[in-house]
Amino acid sequence: MKLDELKTLIRDVPDFPSKGILFRDLTTMLKNGEALQTMAKELADIYRNKGVTKVVGIESRGFIGGSILAYELGCGFVPARKPGKLPAVTIKKAYAKEYGVDTIELHSDAITSDDIVVLHDDLLATGGTMRACYDLVKSMNPKKIYVNFIVELEALKGRSVLPSDCEVTSLLKY
């Protein structure tokens, strides 16, 4: 399967989770084995020669692609979670959302100064969650941080929220 064919497998769900929103449902792509293999290969090909040591997947849909990417690269996977979900000592970052404030956490020992990290989430919309995760990982002083998405909604300009010196990639753009 070719990369551009993946878009045909993503379901559009109007008015979800609220009126006026067009939700891009990746589960219809993920349930197709050939599409999942294509996604895995395409994600991994971006980073194969970059020395990546950790992939951070953002709760919860970022766990799917992030785990696959870590497996394909033969590196570690680190979950970025909502508050209270990680059992050991954590560091956290609060960030603004449309209707309030949310927080993201990592184990305090998850990233070291020797790590080259890919931050992964399924979809880039406004960029707030990824920016918070980026700032949190940056505070742990890794060698390098890359940012990756399966889908990017370009009209929402989420890239503009991310640092300009950050290499951002997405497999599919709408």
Question: Can you name each region flagged by the protein language model?
Answer:
Residues M1-Y174:
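PRPP-associated nucleotide enzymes
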